[in-house]
């Protein structure tokens, strides 16, 4: 049968071609200018906190290995609190369970804001950092498990090398004087935030034991009241500084105490309280365009407390390990626990993050932003291998505070974080000249509208 001219033309017509102005999707682009400013402010605050964190850890190590080390351990193990409520804890435990809940409260605020109002609410911008963070959790966990596969006792520490310490990482950036472009800083912070979310989930599901249903259910009452008041009177709590301390803080403390009594690690309460805070302003208050929401206001109020007090005190009580001289250090580093942690953080993190990012770019036919090369992703991936605060916490949950494996795990965490910081320094310092050019490019505003051109190009692309 002969095809008609119309049918033949339809059959023979070439496949549609993409529009001439179509561009491949960019990975590690600049995102929005507002998000860049916000994250830049967060990282500047974390730089000071990171310096305090490192100083606290160094002081603890020196004190724990000095002739007066007994006084350090006596201070760390000194108990205080109300025993009938199961709250008679050592100072070290108060730092881990209590003060660190403030850190996780901020994590909850940051996570909710990123997924409600930040760049992560857009799938095309969130898929790469979220997937890279997942790869940066999975590969280190597998490497640690492979090293400790024949020891069920030490295998419990598989989650130790999964988290990234953003405060420590940005402190390293400040020390080496890196001009890391904002797009890479945003990528690093996003990795750390998603890492924290995964770590919180791991702590809640794998490191909670003897869960008591009654206090857990009771905790829902103050938590629900806290959420209702924060949502209903968000403008009031944002405008009146002391109101949140007088009304919301007691509800938060009761929630924390009941979660602690339930057997679930109390830091999870901090995350839940952070999730309960509204991100956007209500319509009655002018909506999102009228100014920062309650979550951002609380973040400004609590970040100095977290970065300047809570996390450094936790590091002080957690990082103090009696190494026992060079012989003791060698023994600690020969433990499969320490070997697994070092290999997981120094090798597993870069492999997981960079490998996942590379696979995604190939699978989606995306490309890196023209300002960056794969060596830049590698440098940031090395920085992500600095696992400190959450890693120290998971080590204590895995092996018990002050146990031999716990001490060896902490030595491994410290050694791995130091090694990752040194390697990241070598890579990123070598690229500083290119980063300075990118930094200058970020300042160009040819149309004088207050928004640098790179962010406008990003939004149009």
UniProtKB/Swiss-Prot annotation:
First-listed, main subcellular location of the protein, grouped into a coarse class: membrane
UniProt keyword terms in alphabetical order: Antiport, Cell membrane, Ion transport, Membrane, Sodium, Sodium transport, Transmembrane, Transmembrane helix, Transport
Catalytic reactions of this protein: Na(+)(in) + 2 H(+)(out) = Na(+)(out) + 2 H(+)(in)
The UniProt record lists the keyword Electron transport: no
Region (Disordered): 1-23
One GO term of the biological process aspect: regulation of pH
Membrane topology of this protein: Multi-pass membrane protein
Transmembrane segments: 48-68, 89-109, 127-147, 157-177, 186-206, 211-231, 236-256, 257-277, 305-325, 339-359, 374-394, 408-428
Record bears the keyword Hydrolase: no
GO cellular component assignments: plasma membrane
Protein family according to the UniProt entry: Belongs to the NhaA Na(+)/H(+) (TC 2.A.33) antiporter family.
Task of the protein: Na(+)/H(+) antiporter that extrudes sodium in exchange for external protons.
Protein name: Na(+)/H(+) antiporter NhaA
Protein species of origin: Arthrobacter sp. (strain FB24)
Gene label: nhaA
